[in-house]
């Protein structure tokens, strides 16, 4: 049973990384970031259910990860808002000011 | 299917449900009369005349409220474990939770004073 | 399990410096909210005072035996104390650097100070974190503040772009790190304390499994992103170029120091069962970053980008001490970090001063600066030469100790490449210095012409110049007294948790 959950979280992780690499829109990239964090959460909750059911440290850890992911998403969206105000677009591939 | 013995019922239900949904949709397609007209293509807004386009831009205000909401919504999650084990910890944890809420309140006051909660 | 939540009164002294900073940032926030009239001198005063108090407390307590507090989630020893005081020291130097820049860019001051203080607190907690949860939370506390600081000039598109790039890449790296943490949590049988994880891995005999290897790779990738080692360095030049310059000065030292402390703790305590494995990986990363950082830095045209690549190569040198792994190696690493603060902040102080007066960062616009401002060009020259490691200056002695320790421990290839690349680095530093000092007749570029000459009196100098002169003095003369410094750091590091077994 544990293997299935771990496989699920590994798939979610891979989808998240793939999406981060390929997505053109910034909001979509932020969503992929959330996917990776959710993969971590699934892993932690599964492990804490199977191995550590008395102290449930993993679930506490996942609460912290949820809170921090929310803060990160909020900061990301705020920066997206600032970018949108300045250049009326949120596409990643149009960010080419900083290059060598 | 051999690995997940507990899920046999689930798969039976899944089969039945998918069978029923296909059956019902094909029945309605077979029975219902087919009309074509301009009314068919308008969006459905609870029976009222639709106003404007389906893809409208939301006010940017909603966005600001959503940003503030997300932060405070998630921070309250930390209070649930504390509340569940309140009787085990005694008065000191109560004071610590008060400090935590106080910091959140300072954040809320900050958002308020900086005008993130103003609509106009 | 009975929880002792009033342990704060027992262990309060272990996090007292951090508590002072948190308290002062709350005070700054409340002052900003209650008084609409902006009296900014007070805000600077409060932040600098709290930083000073906390560094004094840290210096008084620097020789402590390892104490584990807060249910095993925080550990205090002399190694952490030294790195924490480095971080506070950087913040003390960086706040005067940013005063005039903020005034010119018309940014809000209280938020800037709050972000700087929060990042400092996050870095300080990161140095002593002993628990996976604490490591993750304090790491994010540091990096979330850094994203906000990068995008602090909201109207500037380049700053926005740097912020979003930093956010995406930093978020990716910390999520990969968290994925590695989740595997460690599972493989050790449900432990989050890093000493208990090692015991759990040894007891469950999973320390050689492929799962541990995946966790190790994930954690190493996350750390390498934070330290900007070479295959994971792509974000550094972009962020250095786009962000406001005082913020870059702050990030280039603080996040490096905190990341280095974290890497040392994780690799030494968590992966203490396979030291040869991580040393090989780190060696490859260090060699790559020394070679690529120095080679790419030659071709740069922007000063900030050049410094970004040079910082990538510097972190490669610093890693030699970590790879060496004995007391002398750690001591020389700590000393080099200490010198690096002076050299790097001194260089950045010069750049901030120049860009405030002319508004450009290009290297070629520095041509002929010597005619207009000898003080600035002299200090820039000294800092750059010290970064390159020319003999009588501080950077030379730091590098000498690092390379000598590496050579004695038998890392010949590493030290050999480090020697060659530091010669290459001298080339591009000298190129800039030649540009500054040589005078092309009748062809002064417009930026230099627009340069405002400062008043020669001593008291009318601005805070940036004070910091600049202080750092230049440090990066010139500290090398002479390296022997007492070395024995001082060696004494205190020998009390740290890595050497008390």
Curated annotation (Swiss-Prot), chain A:
Signal peptide: none annotated. It is an enzyme of class 7 (translocase). It is a multi-pass membrane protein. It catalyses: a plastoquinone + NADH + (n+1) H(+)(in) = a plastoquinol + NAD(+) + n H(+)(out); a plastoquinone + NADPH + (n+1) H(+)(in) = a plastoquinol + NADP(+) + n H(+)(out). The chain crosses the membrane at residues 1-21, 30-50, 63-83. Its EC number is 7.1.1.-. GO terms for cellular component: chloroplast thylakoid membrane. The keyword Lipid metabolism does not apply. NDH shuttles electrons from NAD(P)H:plastoquinone, via FMN and iron-sulfur (Fe-S) centers, to quinones in the photosynthetic chain and possibly in a chloroplast respiratory chain. The immediate electron acceptor for the enzyme in this species is believed to be plastoquinone. Couples the redox reaction to proton translocation, and thus conserves the redox energy in a proton gradient. NDH is composed of at least 16 different subunits, 5 of which are encoded in the nucleus. This is NAD(P)H-quinone oxidoreductase subunit 4L, chloroplastic. It comes from Marchantia polymorpha (Common liverwort). The gene is ndhE.
From Swiss-Prot, chain B:
NDH shuttles electrons from NAD(P)H:plastoquinone, via FMN and iron-sulfur (Fe-S) centers, to quinones in the photosynthetic chain and possibly in a chloroplast respiratory chain. The immediate electron acceptor for the enzyme in this species is believed to be plastoquinone. Couples the redox reaction to proton translocation, and thus conserves the redox energy in a proton gradient. It is found in: Plastid, Chloroplast thylakoid membrane. Belongs to the complex I subunit 3 family. GO terms for biological process: photosynthesis, light reaction. It catalyses: a plastoquinone + NADH + (n+1) H(+)(in) = a plastoquinol + NAD(+) + n H(+)(out); a plastoquinone + NADPH + (n+1) H(+)(in) = a plastoquinol + NADP(+) + n H(+)(out). It comes from Marchantia polymorpha (Common liverwort). The keyword Chloroplast applies. NDH is composed of at least 16 different subunits, 5 of which are encoded in the nucleus. Disulfide bonds: none annotated. It is a multi-pass membrane protein. HAMAP family: NDH1_NuoA. Its main location: plastid. PANTHER family: NADH-UBIQUINONE OXIDOREDUCTASE CHAIN 3. GO terms for molecular function: NADH dehydrogenase (ubiquinone) activity; quinone binding. This is NAD(P)H-quinone oxidoreductase subunit 3, chloroplastic. It is an enzyme of class 7 (translocase). Keywords: Chloroplast, Membrane, NAD, NADP, Plastid, Plastoquinone, Quinone, Thylakoid, Translocase, Transmembrane, Transmembrane helix, Transport.
Curated annotation (Swiss-Prot), chain C:
It catalyses: a plastoquinone + NADH + (n+1) H(+)(in) = a plastoquinol + NAD(+) + n H(+)(out); a plastoquinone + NADPH + (n+1) H(+)(in) = a plastoquinol + NADP(+) + n H(+)(out). GO terms for molecular function: NADH dehydrogenase (ubiquinone) activity; quinone binding. Its main location: plastid. The chain crosses the membrane at residues 15-35, 40-60, 82-102, 107-127, 132-152, 167-187, 212-232, 244-264, 278-298, 307-327, 333-353, 378-398, 410-430, 466-486. GO terms for biological process: ATP synthesis coupled electron transport; photosynthesis, light reaction. Its EC number is 7.1.1.-. InterPro entries: NADH-Q_OxRdtase_suN/2, ND/Mrp_TM, Ndh2_N. The keyword Thylakoid applies. It is found in: Plastid, Chloroplast thylakoid membrane. Keywords: Chloroplast, Membrane, NAD, NADP, Plastid, Plastoquinone, Quinone, Thylakoid, Translocase, Transmembrane, Transmembrane helix, Transport. It is a multi-pass membrane protein. One of its GO terms (cellular component) is chloroplast thylakoid membrane. NDH shuttles electrons from NAD(P)H:plastoquinone, via FMN and iron-sulfur (Fe-S) centers, to quinones in the photosynthetic chain and possibly in a chloroplast respiratory chain. The immediate electron acceptor for the enzyme in this species is believed to be plastoquinone. Couples the redox reaction to proton translocation, and thus conserves the redox energy in a proton gradient. Belongs to the complex I subunit 2 family. HAMAP family: NDH1_NuoN_1. NDH is composed of at least 16 different subunits, 5 of which are encoded in the nucleus. NCBIfam families: NDH_I_N (TIGR01770), PRK02504.1 (NF002701). This is NAD(P)H-quinone oxidoreductase subunit 2, chloroplastic. It comes from Marchantia polymorpha.
């Amino acid at each position: 049973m544990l293997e299935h959950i771990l496989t699920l979280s590994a798939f979610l992780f891979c989808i998240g990384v793939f999406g981060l690499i390929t997505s053109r829109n910034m909001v979509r990239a932020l969503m992929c970031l959330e996917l990776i964090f959710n993969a971590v959460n699934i892993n932690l909750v599964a492990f804490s259910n199977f191995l550590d059911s008395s102290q449930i440290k993993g679930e506490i850890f996942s609460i912290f990860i949820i809170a921090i992911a929310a803060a990160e998403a909020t900061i990301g969206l705020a920066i997206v808002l600032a970018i949108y105000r300045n250049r009326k677009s949120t596409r990643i591939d149009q960010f080419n000011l900083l290059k060598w | 299917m051999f690995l997940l013995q507990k899920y046999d019922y689930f798969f039976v239900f899944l089969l039945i449900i998918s069978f029923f949904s296909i059956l019902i949709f094909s029945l309605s397609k077979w029975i219902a009369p087919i009309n074509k007209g301009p009314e068919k293509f308008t969006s459905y807004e609870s029976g009222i005349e639709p106003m404007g386009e389906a893809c409208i831009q939301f006010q940017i205000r909603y966005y600001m409220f959503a940003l503030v909401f997300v932060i405070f919504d998630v921070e309250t999650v930390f209070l649930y474990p504390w509340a569940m084990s309140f009787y085990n910890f005694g008065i000191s944890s109560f004071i610590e939770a008060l400090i935590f809420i106080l910091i959140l309140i300072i954040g809320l006051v900050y958002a308020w004073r900086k005008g993130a909660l103003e609509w106009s | 399990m009975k929880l002792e939540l009033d342990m704060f009164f027992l262990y309060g002294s272990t996090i007292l410096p951090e508590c002072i900073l948190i308290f002062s940032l709350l005070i700054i926030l409340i002052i900003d909210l209650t008084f609409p009239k902006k009296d900014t001198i007070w805000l600077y005063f409060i932040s600098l005072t709290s930083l000073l108090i906390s560094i004094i407390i840290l210096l008084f307590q620097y020789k402590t035996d390892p104490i584990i507090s807060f249910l095993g989630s925080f550990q205090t020893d002399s190694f952490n104390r030294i790195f924490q005081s480095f971080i506070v020291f950087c913040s003390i130097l960086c706040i005067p650097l940013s005063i005039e820049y903020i005034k010119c860019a018309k940014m809000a001051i209280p938020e800037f100070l709050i972000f700087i203080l929060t990042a400092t607190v996050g870095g300080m907690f990161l140095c002593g974190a002993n628990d996976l949860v604490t490591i993750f939370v304090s790491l994010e506390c540091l990096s979330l503040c850094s994203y906000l600081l990068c995008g602090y000039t909201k109207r500037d598109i380049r700053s926005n772009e740097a912020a979003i790039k930093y956010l995406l890449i930093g978020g990716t790296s910390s999520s990969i790190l968290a994925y590695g943490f989740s595997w460690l949590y599972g493989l050790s049988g449900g432990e989050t304390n890093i000493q208990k994880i090692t015991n759990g891995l040894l007891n469950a005999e999973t320390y050689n499994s492929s799962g541990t290897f995946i966790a190790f790779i994930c954690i190493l990738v996350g750390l390498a992103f934070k330290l900007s080692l070479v295959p994971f360095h792509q974000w550094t030049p972009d962020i250095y170029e786009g962000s406001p310059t005082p913020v870059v000065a702050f990030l280039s030292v603080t996040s490096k120091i905190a990341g280095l402390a974290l890497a040392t703790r994780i690799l030494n305590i968590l992966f203490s069962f396979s030291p040869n494995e991580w040393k090989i990986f780190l060696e490859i990363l260090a060699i790559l970053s020394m070679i690529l950082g120095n080679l790419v830095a030659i071709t740069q045209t922007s000063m900030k980008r050049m410094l970004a690549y040079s910082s990538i190569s510097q972190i490669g040198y610093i890693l030699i001490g970590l790879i060496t792994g004995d007391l002398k190696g750690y001591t020389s690493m700590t000393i080099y970090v200490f010198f690096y603060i002076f050299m790097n902040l001194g260089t950045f102080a010069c750049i901030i001063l120049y860009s405030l007066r002319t508004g450009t960062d290009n290297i070629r616009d520095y041509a002929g600066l010597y005619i207009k401002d000898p003080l600035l060009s002299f200090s820039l020259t000294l800092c750059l030469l010290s970064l390159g490691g020319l003999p009588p200056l501080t950077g030379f002695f730091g590098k000498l100790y690092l390379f000598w320790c590496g050579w004695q421990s038998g890392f010949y290839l590493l030290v050999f490449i480090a020697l060659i690349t530091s010669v290459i680095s001298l080339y591009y530093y000298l190129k800039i210095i030649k540009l500054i000092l040589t005078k092309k007749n009748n062809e002064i570029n417009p930026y230099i012409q627009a340069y405002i000459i400062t008043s020669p009196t001593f008291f009318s100098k601005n805070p940036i110049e004070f910091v600049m002169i202080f750092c230049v003095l440090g990066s010139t003369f500290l090398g002479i007294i390296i022997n007492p410094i070395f024995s001082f750091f060696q004494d205190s590091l020998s009390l740290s948790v890595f050497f008390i077994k």
